[in-house]
Amino acid sequence: KNAEELGAGEIVLTSVDREGTGSGFDSELIKRVTEVVSIPVVVHGGAGRLEHLAQIFNNITEISGVSIASILHYDYIKKYKDLDGYESEGNIDFLRSSKSMSHIHSTNLTNIKEYLISKNINCRVVHDN
């Protein structure tokens, strides 16, 4: 509420304890925030499969969007395994090992959009030229 009162136009709400876990969004935290603010809230942290996206949009209609990362990373890495030259970016040993996170079901933006549209969830659609 303070952020809104100080002039924030949008809140990106991250459940840090759920980041990278694939356990789903923190619905209780999200509800507590969306009930007290009138500005858009984008939620982040916990998405591990497509169903998590549908659940959060269907259960908490006050959110304006989601931010996702892990469910996109592993699909990307499978396609683009050449990590040479990125050693300075951090620990890439896990990515090179080809291990997967058991709670995270990899996907891509096309699949996400098709899934959301199939569930009648508003989604900005970008058409290829």
Predicted regions: what they are:
Residues 1-43, 48-129:
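Alpha/beta catalytic cores of nucleotide-metabolism and tRNA/nucleoside-modifying enzymes
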